[in-house]
Amino acid sequence: VRLKPSPLNALFLAQFISAFVDNMILFIALGIIHRDGYPGYYLPLVQSTFLLSYIVLSPWVGRFADKKSKSQVLMVGNIIKTLGILLLLAKCDPALSYGVVGIGAVIYSPAKYGILPFLARGEDALLRANSRLESYTIVAILTGSVAGGYLSDISIVLSLIACIVLYIISIGVNTLIPKDPGNRGIQYRNAITEFAGDAVTLFRDKQSHFSLIGTGSFWMASAVLRMIIFAWVPLTLGISSRMDISMIIAVTGIGIAIGAVITPYLITVKEYQRTAWYGLGMGICILAFLWITTLPVAIIFLLLIGCMGGIFIVPMNACLQHVGHQTIGAGKTIAIQNFVENSFMFLGVGSYTLAFKLGVSIYTSLAAAGIVLLAFVAYLIVLTYRKE
């Protein structure tokens, strides 16, 4: 009987547990903000410190992931996240504690993708592994969010202890992932100038340029849409229960998971440019929310947004890793992708928060989110036909 999972399955399991806890924490932080009477703007602030960790540390984490063995890097990331939870248990400021969790997450991220070319040989195997990793991550995001909301209602301390136990299990599973050699020659000096140089290299390559703009605009639209739906559901559908809203938001994630699973049957890595049409569909579905007034229709469109989004993003991720692996190294590529995606999200969520403060109507923000995504997709379509 084979009790020890295959290296890829060990990675998927470790990633599932890790992402599950990452998403529990945001809802627990929400509970802590309510319990300790922090002001209302604190949740976006907590989210921002997390995104900021990604933006600030990007130049160094890719090097760290490529220099060391990736399976060790995954452990370091989870140990730092555990420290962040201990800070929350010790009643430290939630924005600071969540920022520490963000540091762990940003270290973890390049390694989980960067180890894939080492474990999955060949383009098609890499696309399949990507598709599965993305699907497991999304299921973890959905179930983790709901578990976080549910547990933090019962007991915040208990839910934090559950997080620590799960991280320890994930660290244990990491020991089953084989060690890749790593590249000891990588230096941390000149990290910023070389990071900028690597970014220029990726943006000069047509494939990776397309993928970076594509994934960045997808995550920006998703992050803003999530914030808007929080306000849109009570306003338009008259539903105010937090648990219900989290379930409605979860529908998009289910759509993304479906999209990620069916992608390999629709698009190959070489046809990555066809993904732009699915981005177009996603943008149109977001704009449709200006006319939606009933729950069943909203659910159908959220499912569609997710599904189109999943097909939009998975081939671009695989394409970017393929180019990166051949040019600047897998870990550095993911670090630049993280930097681009989180900068896009930071700008999107920041603009939305500002608009909200200035009293701009939620429908105007919704229209803006759809139009901005469509503008980026139009740019991708122009890019495709410009150099044929």
Predicted segments with their positions:
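Juxtamembrane intracellular "pre-TM" segments in multi-pass secondary transporters
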Residues: 1-8, 179-212
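Structural signature of the two symmetry-related core transmembrane helices
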Residues: 72-87, 273-288, 370
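Juxtamembrane helix-start elements in MFS-like secondary transporters
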Residues: 39-47, 240-249, 330, 334
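Substrate-agnostic recognition of the 12-TM MFS/MFS-like secondary transporter fold
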Residues: 9-26, 47-65, 69-81, 97-152, ...
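A membrane-interface helix-boundary motif in multi-pass transporters
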Residues: 150-165, 241-246, 353-373
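Helix-loop junctions on the cytosolic side of multi-pass membrane transporters
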Residues: 114, 118-119, 160-189, 381-388
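C-terminal transmembrane helical hairpin of 12-TM major facilitator-type secondary transporters
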Residues: 273-313
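Short amphipathic helix-loop junctions that connect adjacent transmembrane helices
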Residues: 26-41, 227-243
